[in-house]
Structures are given as C-alpha cells and as structure tokens.
C-alpha cells in the first residue's frame, strides 16, 4: 500500500483561476469520493484546470475536474474520469454563496485539492471574471515586481 501523504500536502492546483478571475472569498469544502478516486488522488492523478463549481438544489457540485483512474482500479467498477463530485460545506456558507453567485458576474472556481487530517479537501473561491485588459494589467504588474526584485538582488551583490 502506498504511503499516506503529509496532512497539509497539495494534490492539484488550478493556476489558471488566479489568472482568469479576481478571487474574493475562499472556502474549504469536503468532497464525496469513491475509493478509486482517493487512490488516484494519492497517486497525484488530478487536474483542476477546467473545473468549476455548480449550485444545484441548494448543494455544491464540482464539475470538470479530471481524476485519472489507476490501472489497478477494480474490475467491477467502471471509473469515470470527469464524474461530478459533491462538495460539503456548512448550510450557512452555502446560502451565502448562493446569494452572491446570483449577483451578476460572480462564480465559484476550485483553487486546489489538498489533504487535511487524511481527508481530501477542495479550496474554492468566490470570484469575478477578469476582462482582457485586467489580465494584461496583472501581467504588467507581475513583470514590474520581477524587475524590481532582480534590480535589488543584483545591487546587493
């Protein structure tokens, strides 16, 4: 059996989310998973880049998250890589998120999957979409910070 991961280790990150959205509020949600999905997560076979969170009947669901089944997965279960996964949050948090998502321009995006006390958690964020010029501005700011850091580093030598 594989070694259990560190309690706070990350499984997968959604780097595209920070580029495409203004992240406003973050939440940590539990996930309802099948056994083969947990094994795939332990092996690090997860991808969040196309994932998004959908609200249906007062519950949160993670869609578009790819979990590739291991070759040693059970023969009597047919694993589906893009299966919809239910997210677990407190009722008050879900109500608050429903109210904000119904406002124009807000959506829920998954940021990362990580282990916490032997359980898989999904960090989600309430986000607003960035326009193209906002993306360009954030790239310019990031490059400006890099240049300043380079200048300070070379000056200190």
From Swiss-Prot:
One of its GO terms (cellular component) is cytosol. Gene3D superfamilies: 2.40.280.10. Keywords: Cytoplasm, RNA-binding. GO terms for biological process: trans-translation. It holds the Pfam family SmpB. Residues 133-157 are annotated as: Disordered. SUPFAM superfamilies: Small protein B (SmpB). One of its GO terms (molecular function) is RNA binding. It is found in: Cytoplasm. Its main location: cytoplasm. The keyword Ion transport does not apply. InterPro entries: SmpB, SsrA-bd_prot, SsrA-bd_prot_CS. Required for rescue of stalled ribosomes mediated by trans-translation. Binds to transfer-messenger RNA (tmRNA), required for stable association of tmRNA with ribosomes. tmRNA and SmpB together mimic tRNA shape, replacing the anticodon stem-loop with SmpB. tmRNA is encoded by the ssrA gene; the 2 termini fold to resemble tRNA(Ala) and it encodes a 'tag peptide', a short internal open reading frame. During trans-translation Ala-aminoacylated tmRNA acts like a tRNA, entering the A-site of stalled ribosomes, displacing the stalled mRNA. Belongs to the SmpB family. This is SsrA-binding protein. It comes from Verminephrobacter eiseniae (strain EF01-2).
């Amino acid at each position: 059996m594989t070694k259990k991961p560190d309690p706070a280790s990350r499984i997968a990150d959604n780097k595209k989310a920070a580029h495409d959205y203004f992240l406003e509020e973050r939440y940590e949600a539990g996930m309802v998973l099948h056994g083969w999905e947990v094994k795939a997560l332990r092996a690090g076979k997860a991808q969040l880049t196309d994932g998004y969170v959908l609200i249906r009947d007062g519950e949160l669901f993670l869609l578009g998250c790819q979990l590739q089944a291991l070759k040693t997965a059970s023969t009597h279960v047919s694993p589906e890589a893009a299966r919809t996964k239910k997210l677990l949050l407190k009722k008050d948090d879900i109500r608050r998120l429903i109210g904000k998502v119904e406002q124009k321009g807000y959506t829920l995006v998954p940021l990362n999957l990580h282990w916490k006390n032997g359980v898989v958690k999904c960090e989600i964020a309430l986000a607003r979409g960035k326009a193209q010029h906002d993306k360009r501005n954030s790239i310019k700011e990031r490059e400006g910070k890099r240049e300043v850091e380079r200048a300070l580093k070379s000056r200190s030598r």
